Structure formats: C-alpha cells, structure tokens
Amino acid sequence: MKRILIVIDMQNDFVTGPLGSKEAQNIVQSIKEKILNYISDGNKFYFTKDTHDKGVYLETLEGEHLPIEHCIRYTDGWDIVPELKEFTKDLASYGINRNEILKNHFGYEWWSEYFTKDSFNYEFELVGVCTDICVITNALLLRTYFPESKIIVDSSCCAGSTPEKHKAALEVMKSCHIDVI
C-alpha cells in the first residue's frame, strides 16, 4: 500500500495572512510532525498551493464571492508557511520530482498526473486548510478518481474558514466514505 500525504494550501495568506486564523496557526506543528513521520516511513507527500495571478482574481467567480486577494503568485502570502517550507526544497532526498502542486481553483483536477488511476494500492491522507473549501473538494476529487482507495482526513490537522464549517465539512466527508480521524 502506497501512503501519500497531501498538505492542502498551508500558505501564509491562509495561516497568518488576510484569511488566516488561530485554528490554522494551531495545526502547523502537527502537520510538520506528520510530514516527518511520512519521511521516516519512506512515504511521499505533496503540497497544494492556491495560486492566483495579480489583477485577475477579483474578476473570477471566487473573487466575486470572496473579494479578498490572496495567494497571489510569487508573493509572500503565496509561499508555504516557514515551518513547512523546508519540505519543499530538497525534493530529490524525498524521492519526489515535484511536490508543489499549483491550483487556481478549490480542487486539483489532474490527480491522475501523479498517481496511476487504475491502481487501488493508494492510501491518501489529507491535512490543511480550509476544511470546508479546498480540503473537502480535493478529498471528493480523490474519491471520484480513486473510488477504491482509502482516503483519510486528519481533523486535528485541518482548520476551516470557521469552526462550525470545519465540523460540517467533516460530516459531509464521512458520508462520502472518507475516513475522518
């Protein structure tokens, strides 16, 4: 069984920036420990990065609903938080060619670029922010692409846009056969 950790959008803007929260700040150390466990067990991990271009975001549907510019490509807010950034540098030592996955929507539509679609030997674990937006979207996309794979969301390593929405998203994921721990 291949165990794969997917760290969703742990970027400065979502942790300490304009969309940050105390809850997001509180999960950083737990995510770091989880990454270290994956490394010591020889498993792979990936980061998704919410990515928007300057001057375009506010014209998108997302920008209409959430008119707060964030994760603008090549800004400090776009970067992975400093406590986790070290895990994006020396990729060869982790046996990974590229572990930052850029996406300009809630979910990444091309998971099959990274993982063989017909393989049932994957166990995906998701952590990060926001539980009720990007975590749930990617969990459901993985469920769609890999219907027989085990998908886990570690609720103690996730934060939602509000605590209430975090809890609601976890319940929805449970009903879609995603293991919430």
What are these regions (language model features)?
Residues 23, 69, 127-128, 157-158:
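A generic structural signal for short
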Residues 10, 50-51, 129-131, 157:
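Active-site metal-binding loops of divalent metal-dependent hydrolases
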Residues 31-38, 136-146:
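Histidine-anchored nucleotide/phosphate-binding helix
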Residues 100-137, 159-181:
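Conserved N-terminal glycine/acidic-rich loop preference
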Residues 88-91, 133, 143-146, 177:
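Short, well-ordered alpha-helical segments in soluble proteins
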Residues 1-100, 150-152, 167-175:
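Active-site acidic carboxylates
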